[in-house]
């Protein structure tokens, strides 16, 4: 029996959530041994390979499509946004002693998605959404708390990098949702990997670093690049074809819970008690934001049905 489209969407986003949590574990394991530029070179070169293999096996993806000028512009913008967002993301993981912390802070993306909706689409906040934003920001501050820390140390540390990362990821999310029916998930994933591989290669050459890395780091990158840039990206973009972004966001907000488990099993580390509390607060905030968005959408749908027809 074929799955309903909605259930396909839930299956895709659940897969993206679980595989996405492993990215924090494998990338941190590799970044302990190699530089950020070496990591990016191997991580995204492998991601390109995984995506090309998937393209060859998929009849839909094998169809040659001529990319229009407008599509090229969108892919260019998305690629540049990914350079900033993903570069800051992995820099945050490298800077953090426990990769669970960036995974909790990743939920700030939904705050920026909501704010961009207000700025670009002139949307209005509901009470639940306001409460969710306040709760998420509170949780982020709790997670980022450092006794004796300065604004400079915050901005250059893991928390500041995640602030930069999530603001740009929000732009990426809105672009992906808008163009998901004209640009395939595979095209988006390959475009992302190509831009990031190019950036890492240029920086590797500029700073005169070698592409030779330890075998243990290569194994971590091999596993992580399959689960992260390939499987997570394909799953995220595929889910958006079947379910609303708000539903996907609610499920993906729990990624940090899977990450905590993975980090504990791999590194034997757990977040501090106050960091765990802050993380749970941010997850609760995201769920309130998305619940408010769904209530608003439901209300607008009902009002549209009540409108008289000519």
Question: Where are the regions that the model predicts?
Answer:
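Hydrophobic alpha-helical transmembrane segments of multi-pass integral membrane proteins
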Residues: 7-15, 37-57, 72-77, 132-135, ...
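Specific transmembrane alpha-helical segments of multi-pass solute transporters/efflux pumps
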Residues: 19-23, 59-100, 105, 142, ...
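Glycine-/small-residue-enriched transmembrane alpha-helix faces in small-molecule transporters
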Residues: 1-42, 84, 88, 151-178, ...
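Specific alpha-helical transmembrane segments that line the substrate/conduction pathway
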Residues: 38-49, 90-124, 245-265
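Hydrophobic/small/kink-forming positions within alpha-helical transmembrane segments
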Residues: 18-21, 25, 79, 83-87, ...
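Hydrophobic transmembrane alpha-helices of multi-pass small-molecule transport proteins
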Residues: 116, 128-147, 200, 253-254, ...
């Amino acid at each position: 029996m074929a799955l309903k489209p909605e259930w396909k969407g839930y299956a895709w986003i659940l897969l993206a959530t679980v595989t996405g949590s492993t990215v924090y574990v494998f990338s941190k394991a590799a970044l302990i041994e190699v530089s950020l530029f070496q990591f990016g070179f191997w991580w995204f070169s492998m991601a390109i390979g995984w995506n090309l293999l998937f393209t060859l096996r998929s009849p839909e993806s094998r169809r040659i499509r001529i990319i229009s000028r407008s599509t090229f512009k969108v892919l260019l913008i998305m690629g540049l946004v990914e350079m900033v967002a993903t570069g800051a993301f992995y820099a945050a993981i490298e800077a953090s002693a426990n990769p669970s912390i960036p995974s909790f802070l990743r939920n700030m993306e939904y705050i920026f998605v909501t704010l961009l909706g207000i700025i670009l689409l002139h949307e209005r906040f509901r009470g639940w959404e306001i409460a969710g934003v306040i709760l998420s920001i509170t949780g982020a501050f709790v997670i980022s708390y450092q006794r004796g820390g300065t604004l400079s140390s915050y901005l250059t540390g893991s928390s500041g990098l995640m602030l930069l990362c999530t603001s740009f990821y929000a732009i990426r999310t809105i672009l992906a949702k808008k163009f998901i029916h004209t640009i395939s998930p595979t095209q988006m994933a390959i475009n992302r990997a190509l831009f990031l591989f190019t950036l890492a290669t240029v920086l590797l050459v500029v700073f005169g670093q070698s592409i030779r890395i330890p075998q243990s780091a290569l194994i971590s990158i091999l596993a992580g690049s399959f689960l992260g840039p390939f499987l997570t990206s394909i799953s995220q973009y595929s889910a958006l074809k079947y379910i609303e972004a708000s539903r996907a966001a609610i499920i993906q907000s729990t990624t940090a819970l899977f990450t905590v488990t993975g980090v504990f099993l791999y590194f034997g580390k757990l977040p501090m008690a106050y960091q765990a509390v802050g993380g749970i607060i941010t997850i609760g905030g995201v769920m309130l934001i998305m619940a408010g968005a769904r209530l608003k959408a439901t209300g607008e749908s009902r009002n549209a049905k009540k409108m008289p027809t000519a």
